Structure formats: structure tokens, C-alpha cells
Amino acid sequence: MMRIAKILSLAVGAIALCVTSAAAKKPIDIDAKMQEYGLVDIATIDASILVELKYAGTDNFVGSNMYGSLRKAYFRPEIARAIAAVQRELRRIDSHLSLIIYDAARPQSAQQQMWNVVKDTRYRRYVAKPNRGGHHNFGIAVDLSIARDGVPVDMGSDFDSFSEVSHIDNEASLLRRRLITREALDNRRLLRRLMRARGFSTYRREWWHFQQYDINYARRTFRLLDF
């Protein structure tokens, strides 16, 4: 897992103070809030999909829990159904394989925390500005990978690796320079093929990120997770 905590230590320290201050307030029932906003837990659609929300722990680029008690992956219902369809196809290909979800619907408060960390660094291009919301803030994006028997397969880089190796727009060059393996490239291509077949589009800097809907349409149509 690539870490930028040392580079961003001052920003992370500021976030820690904010989290401490926020902890003094009455905590919200985040699962109830997600449902209030019309989102569904992916486990209610397909319980076989693995969920390991990276921002609900410390194994992320910030190095702190930004999701509090949230442990479930929430999406708009049609997005959840599309992901479940990908899972069925993946299991049909190989019953030992499963999707593993690293991020799903993201409250705007968590988006603000991420932005506070990266806004004055070269990593800001990887994080959507929180003022209007990005795809995750509407429940229409997913960060995920493939696992075999519960263990993530080789994708060439870790989740949230803010580097060229996570990009998908020049993978032939990455392979030629031995920055990723043929196995990793094949795994990426399998994931993309299955996700695209269910209407998802990609983000060129992150092999793990998939989304549906144009963001401007989403802002006009869907409810921002403004909590």
C-alpha cells in the first residue's frame, strides 16, 4: 500500500483534530442515513460479494478512519443490481472468484476530509472537490477488485496507489517496462470487461474505479449525500 502520510503529515494532523471535535457531537446512524437517501446495502442484493471498506479503517492514503461505524457498501438500487450481475458472471467464469468492494457511497463529510489532505499537493487530481460532489457522493460509483478464495488477485498496484502504475490508459507501456505483470494486466482487463458490460465507465487514473451516469446529470437528478 503506497503511503503519502509522511508527505501530508500536517494535513492529517489537522484532520485528526477535526475528527476529535466531531466525536464530541452526537453520532449519526449512518446506515439509517444511507437508507433515508434511497441507497441499498449490496449485501441485501448479493451477500456473496466481499466488502472491505478501506476508508472505514486505517489502510488508506490518509491513514485514518473516515467512515466511523460504516461497514456496509451502499449504492443506488440500480447500481447495486448491476454490480450483483457482474458478480454472477464472474462466479460463472470461475466459482473461486468474487468481487471485493473497497469503497461505495461516500458521505460528503468524508469527501471533505480527503480533499483537506490533498488540496495543496500534487495528489489533488485523484480526489474530487467536495463542494458539488463526485460520483461516490451520489452512490453511483464503486471502487473494487477481484479476489480468489478471499485473497485479492494481482492488479499491479494497491488500491489508492497514487502513481502511474494505477493508470489504465497506457498499460502496454507499464507491461513493457515491467511495472506490472501480464497476470495483473489480464486481471484488470477481466474486471473492466465485466463492469463495462453492465454499463460502468472507467477512470483512467484508477484501475479500481467504476461509475455510471454523467456527473452533471447526477447532480441534477440524484440526492447528494450531504452529511
Where are these regions (language model features)?
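Coiled-coil-like amphipathic alpha-helices with heptad-repeat character
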Residues: M1, T20-S21
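Bacterial N-terminal signal peptides that target proteins for export
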Residues: M1-S9
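Bacterial N-terminal signal peptides
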Residues: S9-C18
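Extracytoplasmic cell-surface/polysaccharide-interacting catalytic and binding patches
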Residues: S21-A104, M114-R205, Y213-F227
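Segments that shape or occlude catalytic/ligand-binding pockets
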Residues: P107
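Short, well-ordered surface patches within globular domains
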Residues: A110
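Conserved metal-phosphate-binding beta-hairpin within the catalytic cores
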Residues: F210
